[in-house]
């Protein structure tokens, strides 16, 4: 099986398993209840990924952020750019991005409310795409369009699936192993198939403090595991919490959880 087909099958299998566990249809905008959590000061000085990207991207360039979310990367990078084009399909995320841009007077950002494969944008100097690809089924078309629209491509992703820390809980709660999404290892295989030789840099980030309380842990884990109140799965989850969580530095984290750190995968498309 080719690397691109393997990628697509992993995404489809994970999505099918998720759909099978859901008790209700997902909302049209899956970020509507959480978009406000992605607000961030564009001029913050404690974000190692932002600092890394600002050093790597020369000032005065036109930048494209594909899957820009609430602007956590797009707005800080816009401060040094000639122009920032932020492509984002979620209406609630676009609203947050526009609000934060207005609040902090960042005026050189064009928001394109669209999926990437449908978006119509001009060619830019640099395209960035952070923590988006894990769920993209047509990975080849997605990457090729990035290459067609940028002199340099910078993809940010973890060395493992973003939710991999809770995969062991999935089996304990549901009785079956969690089917993983693809991440960095599979992406490098895809790039190899596409004859791309990227540079890969690790951005060392501090561990997340975790959940603020056991109650917040229960609520968030239940949502991520598609567990509903008063169900046998919720009963199992509640019984497991004190076994699988440890209190550390004022928060609760999953014991033995992998420390996910972003990798910046960059290359200059040929031609």
What residues fall within each predicted segment?
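A short glycine-rich, Lys/Arg-flanked "PGG" loop and its adjoining helix->strand segment in the class I
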Residues: 140-154
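Class I SAM-dependent methyltransferase SAM/SAH-binding core
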Residues: 70-117
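A short SAM/SAH-binding and catalytic strip from SAM-dependent methyltransferases
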Residues: 126-138
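Conserved Class I S-adenosyl-L-methionine
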Residues: 199-271
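Conserved class I S-adenosyl-L-methionine
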Residues: 1-57, 61-69, 152-179
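Short alpha-helix
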Residues: 180-195
């Amino acid at each position: 099986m080719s690397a691109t087909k393997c990628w697509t099958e992993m995404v489809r299998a994970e999505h099918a398993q998720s759909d099978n566990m859901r008790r209700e249809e997902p909302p049209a905008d899956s970020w509507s209840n959480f978009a406000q959590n992605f607000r961030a000061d564009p001029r913050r000085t404690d974000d190692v990924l932002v600092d890394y990207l600002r050093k790597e991207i020369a000032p005065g360039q036109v930048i494209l952020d594909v899957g820009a979310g609430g602007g956590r990367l797009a707005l800080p990078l816009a401060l040094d750019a000639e122009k920032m084009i932020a492509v984002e399909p979620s209406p609630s995320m676009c609203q947050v991005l526009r609000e934060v841009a207005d609040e902090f007077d960042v005026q050189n950002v064009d928001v394109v409310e669209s999926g990437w494969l449908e978006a119509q944008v001009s060619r830019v100097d640099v395209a960035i795409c952070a923590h988006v690809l894990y769920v993209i089924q047509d990975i080849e078309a997605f990457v090729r369009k990035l290459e067609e629209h940028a002199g340099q491509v910078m993809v940010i992703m973890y060395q493992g699936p973003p939710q991999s820390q809770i995969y062991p809980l999935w089996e304990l709660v549901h009785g079956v192993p969690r089917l993983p999404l693809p991440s960095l290892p599979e992406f490098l295989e895809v790039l190899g198939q596409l004859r791309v030789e990227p540079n890969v840099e690790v951005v060392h980030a501090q561990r997340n403090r975790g959940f603020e309380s056991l109650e917040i842990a229960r609520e968030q884990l239940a949502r991520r595991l598609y567990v509903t109140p008063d169900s046998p799965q919720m009963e199992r989850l509640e019984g497991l919490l004190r076994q699988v969580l440890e209190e550390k530095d004022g928060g609760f984290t999953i014991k033995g959880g992998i420390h996910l750190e972003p990798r910046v995968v960059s290359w200059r498309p040929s031609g």
